[in-house]
């Protein structure tokens, strides 16, 4: 039984490692149109700008004859105060480490305006820009929106490098200049095929990777016989950007409609997510220098962060950048196994984007930082995949699984993703980060019509009654037009995950006490030493009566800032009876303001394992059980309210219908952290931790009572028979024999076995002794001396 217990423990542990889903992004489709950026003007006296400049930037779009104005200010959030760049050698060792100086990077944010025929200007969207060259002939890149249609500005060299085979050709104009394309210029997608070639638009294919028998982390669970394996993997990508390009724990599909547009759970005040980025050799090789690669990464994060700031009140901020040399090694170093040439052969197979994620995740798992996640930037693709991510791994440190094998059922899972370089890299970056935050794909016509997608459970629907989201949002499976924001369904999904603590948020810091690269910079949205408040500059501070945007001090009579402090009401501290964080149940008590501070006290939960109801225990702030989580996540596909957990051992959600006890239903979900699991342990990020061998044996016994009882009864019966046999044997030994004893002075005649003289007699004749032929002893034999009575002898 010890061996069996060990085997079951190994199986269950292995099964708990691979309940994650990864998602992939695919390259965009061809462009129908492309424009030249003409007559760019920096509106400063000398047409010069520095890292802390506030200015307007205007230009024309040819041949559309539109005049655009970008009203810009520094984006100090994009780099942390101690942001650093590590330049690695070919073996993956740090060659040198440098601090990223904020003054060296002219990174801006702001708003986009369009000039009307009347000459007036109308604000039409947001803008993010990285200035490469100022003066009278400026060069810049970035993205801005016009009525939710994103406009991408890229240098000619980048367009040429990533030009789609069917994109419009360029003229012979020499030198570097700027081009622009809109999301609406990308060819409209059809959904008559699932697999797309490199000429297809970028998509996310996490759904195409095996996760048990599923093809997407949100696919409905398939019934499995009890003897099937307990693990698998599901990976997805962004071009049909993501049928699936995420890997991780994902909430039950039946809840997506219930939370559409619900922002409960998302932060009410600004939070900062520090991230790390690595550029592999293929990515670095596309730039003239390693410094240019670093600059491009900053530009990508600058653009991607805006959708998180506007939607979730979370800034994506660079904490560390690692740059690998542009010359790819002949053989990847063990320190950086992900750093390989595109299409490199590993055995009989190519090194795919999934392999890069797997090996990069193992690398990230060894990092000891508190970053929200790490991203690997590469120039490689697998078919038309341009991105891949583990789902719902925000703030997760360490690694689960094994990266030493390329078997899809054995993977390394951590807070990591992979993004390929495209001409809209920022969008791929934002999409893959969405999966890290736990978002699934928006529904498109293909997913809505897929017979394996009952009740549209694999994706985020447009509304509670409409499936197809129309390809308008950030988590659309393919790149397309007007993709600049998250859908209401994605917003509700991510916020509800935060509210239910099904993703970690402990790495998201407030905007107070976050050192920025700019030091004491009023207007960067971060409250630093010496500042009372910082509402983010003149534009962001409009209507704020508590904070002076010029001095970052409270206005006269103000004690706090309503915009950034949860216990502030009309610029005064809220009373101690004010609830600043509502209770979500018996395991998550409400928090109240202190009355002498603008900050809400730390969110606290009841201890995991604490009883909160009949057969219910606290786990991650929720009053729940394994059965209840099964009903919540898989009930609609199994047996509704009578759905129960398949067993009490692992941390992957596996359920059953009590009337079909031998059929196992499982998906890509994991039980909440703190949920009890085998051996007296608790689930933590999909793994059963804290179990002991003794408890595992006890747990195994309790889970197999019929077998144990049967074996115990059988063994007990055998023992009873053995005892009875012994008792009977001893009783016969003590039974008196009706046998004549030899006289005390006479030597008994020893028997001599000469064989049977006739038919073999019975061993004992009735009322007498066995009959033998005897030979008399020698006549002169001296008699032996007997010490006493001879014991009886039994012959058989």
From Swiss-Prot:
Active site: 432
Compositionally biased region (Pro residues): 775-786
Domain Disintegrin residue range list: 519-608
Cofactor binding, per record: Binds 1 zinc ion per subunit.
Pfam families found in the cross-reference section: Disintegrin, Reprolysin_5
Keywords for the protein's UniProt record, in alphabetical order: Disulfide bond, Glycoprotein, Hydrolase, Membrane, Metal-binding, Metalloprotease, Protease, Signal, Transmembrane, Transmembrane helix, Zinc
Residues binding Zn(2+), per UniProt: 431, 435, 441
Enzyme Commission number(s) of this protein: 3.4.24.-
Classification via PROSITE patterns: ADAM_MEPRO, DISINTEGRIN_2
Major location category of this protein: membrane
Signal sequence coordinates: 1-23
One function term, GO molecular function aspect: metal ion binding
Extracellular side: 24-706
Record-given protein name: Disintegrin and metalloproteinase domain-containing protein B
Organism: Arthroderma otae (strain ATCC MYA-4605 / CBS 113480) (Microsporum canis)
Native organism taxonomy: Eukaryota, Fungi, Dikarya, Ascomycota, Pezizomycotina
Gene: ADM-B
């Amino acid at each position: 039984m010890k061996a069996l217990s060990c085997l079951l423990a190994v199986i269950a542990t292995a099964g708990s490692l691979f309940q994650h889903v990864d998602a992939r992004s695919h390259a965009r489709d061809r462009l129908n149109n492309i424009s030249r950026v003409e007559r760019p003007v920096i509106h400063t006296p000398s047409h010069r700008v520095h890292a802390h400049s506030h200015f307007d930037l205007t230009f024309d779009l040819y041949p559309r004859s539109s005049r655009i104005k970008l009203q810009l200010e520094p984006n100090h959030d994009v780099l942390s105060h101690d942001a650093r760049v590590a330049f690695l050698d070919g073996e993956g060792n740090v060659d040198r480490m440098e601090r990223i100086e904020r003054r060296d990077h002219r990174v801006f944010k702001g708003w986009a305006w369009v000039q009307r025929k009347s000459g007036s200007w109308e604000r039409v969207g947001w803008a993010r820009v990285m200035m490469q060259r100022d003066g009278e002939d400026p060069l810049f890149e970035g993205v801005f929106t016009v009525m939710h249609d994103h406009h991408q500005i890229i240098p000619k060299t980048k367009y040429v490098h990533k030009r789609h085979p069917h994109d419009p050709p360029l003229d012979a104009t020499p030198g570097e200049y700027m081009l622009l394309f809109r999301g609406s210029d990308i060819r409209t997608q059809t959904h008559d095929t699932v697999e797309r070639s490199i000429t297809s638009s970028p998509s996310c294919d996490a759904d195409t990777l095996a996760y048990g028998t599923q093809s997407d982390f949100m696919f409905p669970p398939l019934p499995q016989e009890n003897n099937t394996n307990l693990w698998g993997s599901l990976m997805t990508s962004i071009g049909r950007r993501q049928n699936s390009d995420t890997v991780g724990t994902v909430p039950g599909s039946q809840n997506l409609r219930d939370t559409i547009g619900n922002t409960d759970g998302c932060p009410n005040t600004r939070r900062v997510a520090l991230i790390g980025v690595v550029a592999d050799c293929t990515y670095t090789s596309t730039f003239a220098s390693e410094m240019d690669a670093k600059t491009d990464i900053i530009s990508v994060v600058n653009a991607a962060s805006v959708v998180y700031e506007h939607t979730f009140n979370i800034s994506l901020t660079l904490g560390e950048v690692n740059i690998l040399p542009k010359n790819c090694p002949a053989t990847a170093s063990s320190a950086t196994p992900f750093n390989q040439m595109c299409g490199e052969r590993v055995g009989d197979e190519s090194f795919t984007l999934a392999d890069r994620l797997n090996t990069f995740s193992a690398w990230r798992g060894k990092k000891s930082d508190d970053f929200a996640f790490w991203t690997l930037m590469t120039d490689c693709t697998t078919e038309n995949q341009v991105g891949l991510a583990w789902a719902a791994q925000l703030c997760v440190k360490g690694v689960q699984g094994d990266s030493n094998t390329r078997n899809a059922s054995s993977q390394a899972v951590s807070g990591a993703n992979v993004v390929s370089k495209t001409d809209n890299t920022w969008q791929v970056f934002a999409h893959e980060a969405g999966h890290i935050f736990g978002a699934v794909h928006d529904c498109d016509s293909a997913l809505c019509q897929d017979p394996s997608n009952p009740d549209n459970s694999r994706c985020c629907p447009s509304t509670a009654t409409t499936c197809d989201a129309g390809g308008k949002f950030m988590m659309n499976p393919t790149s397309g037009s007007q993709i600049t924001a998250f859908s209401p369904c994605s917003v509700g999904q991510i916020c509800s995950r935060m509210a239910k603590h099904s993703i970690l948020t402990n790495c998201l810091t407030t905007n107070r006490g976050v050192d920025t690269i700019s030091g004491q910079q009023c207007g960067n949205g971060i409250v630093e030493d010496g500042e009372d408040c910082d509402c983010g500059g003149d534009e962001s501070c409009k209507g704020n009566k508590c904070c002076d945007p010029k001095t970052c001090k409270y206005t006269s009579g103000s004690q706090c800032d309503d915009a950034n402090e949860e216990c502030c009401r009309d610029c005064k501290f809220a009373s101690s009876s004010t609830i600043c964080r509502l209770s979500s149940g018996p395991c998550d008590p409400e928090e109240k303001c202190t009355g002498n501070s603008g900050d809400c006290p730390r969110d606290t939960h009841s201890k995991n394992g604490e009883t909160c109801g009949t057969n219910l225990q606290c786990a991650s702030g929720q009053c729940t059980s394994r059965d209840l989580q099964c009903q919540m996540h898989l009930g609609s596909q199994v047996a509704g309210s009578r759905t129960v957990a398949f067993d009490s051992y692992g941390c992957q959600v596996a359920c059953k219908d009590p009337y079909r006890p031998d059929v196992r239903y499982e998906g890509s979900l994991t039980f909440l952290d703190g949920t009890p699991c085998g051996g007296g342990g608790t689930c933590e990020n999909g793994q059963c931790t804290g179990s002991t061998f003794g408890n595992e044996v006890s747990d195994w016994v309790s889970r197999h009572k019929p077998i144990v009882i049967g074996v115990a009864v059988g063994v007990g019966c055998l023992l009873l028979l053995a005892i009875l046999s012994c008792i009977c044997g001893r009783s016969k030994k003590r039974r008196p024999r009706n046998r004549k004893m030899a006289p005390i002075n006479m030597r008994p005649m020893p028997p001599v076995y000469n064989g049977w003289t006739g038919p073999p007699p019975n061993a004992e004749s009735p009322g007498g002794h066995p009959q033998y032929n005897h030979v008399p002893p020698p006549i002169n034999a001296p008699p032996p001396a007997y010490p006493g009575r001879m014991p009886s002898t039994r012959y058989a």
